[in-house]
């Protein structure tokens, strides 16, 4: 879903066979988009530091997902606490960082984690509210969400 100058993507476990596959697809997609953005910048003759995206990866088991029609156009959207929390994580991921919540990484199985070079047992988490890059809204609305850089 397109949101202002951002994009929200959903990775339903049912679509990816299981939760681990969905978590892996989410992480792989963020990494691929970040790499692609840098390639586009270089191809366009731009400094890669001038073309940066923020990534906030989160897990939500209970969002409302459905179709909403606005201005005669139907689009799929999701609503709920997890969606708002993901937005707070994303807002804190400055400088092209990929910030992933502990909730997301807990759904990543050992085989999928190894396939994408992640050792979930060695991850160091920081509470969102403790990040220097967390805006006031993130500090206020979701300070205790544990996140790590990927």
Q: Which positions does each model-derived feature cover?
A:
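Acidic/proline- and glycine-rich, intrinsically disordered low-complexity segments
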Residues: 82-88
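Intrinsically disordered, glycine/charged-rich C-terminal tails and inter-domain linkers
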Residues: 63, 73-74, 85, 94-150
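Amphipathic alpha-helical segments that line or abut small-molecule/effector binding pockets
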Residues: 24-35
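Catalytic core of nucleotidyl cyclases, primarily class III adenylyl/guanylyl cyclases
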Residues: 1-24, 39-81
């Amino acid at each position: 879903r397109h949101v202002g100058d951002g994009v929200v993507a959903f990775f339903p476990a049912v679509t990816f066979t299981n939760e681990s596959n969905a978590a892996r697809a989410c992480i792989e997609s963020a990494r691929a988009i970040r790499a692609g953005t840098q390639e586009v910048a270089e191809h366009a003759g731009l400094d890669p530091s001038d073309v940066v995206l923020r990534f906030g990866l989160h897990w939500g088991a209970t969002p409302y997902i459905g179709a909403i029609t606005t201005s005669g156009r139907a689009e799929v959207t999701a609503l709920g606490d997890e969606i708002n929390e993901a937005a707070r994580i994303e807002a804190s991921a400055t400088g092209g960082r990929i910030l992933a919540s502990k909730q997301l990484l807990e759904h990543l199985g050992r085989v999928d984690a190894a396939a994408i070079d992640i050792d979930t047992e060695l991850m160091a988490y920081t509470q969102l509210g403790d990040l220097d890059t967390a805006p006031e809204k993130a500090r206020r609305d979701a300070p205790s969400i544990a996140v790590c850089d990927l």
